């Protein structure tokens, strides 16, 4: 059982390590949608135009929300 867990972790690690850096930029809407400051006030029906990125905004994106949030917009 322990060998199986180690094998699974190794497969996940190798998959992440071999991923190209540019894949994050090519997948524009991967992640959780968020509300940018330009989206207007909190009203039902407003679209969420930003995307939350865990490790900050990738190149070509900019931070679109004031504060410590990582809500980014292309």
Curated annotation (Swiss-Prot):
It is found in: Secreted; Nematocyst. Pfam families: Toxin_4. Residues 1-19 form the signal peptide. It comes from the Eukaryota. Residues 20-28 form a propeptide. Binds specifically to voltage-gated sodium channels (Nav), thereby delaying their inactivation during signal transduction. This is Delta-stichotoxin-Sgt2a. It comes from Stichodactyla gigantea (Giant carpet anemone).
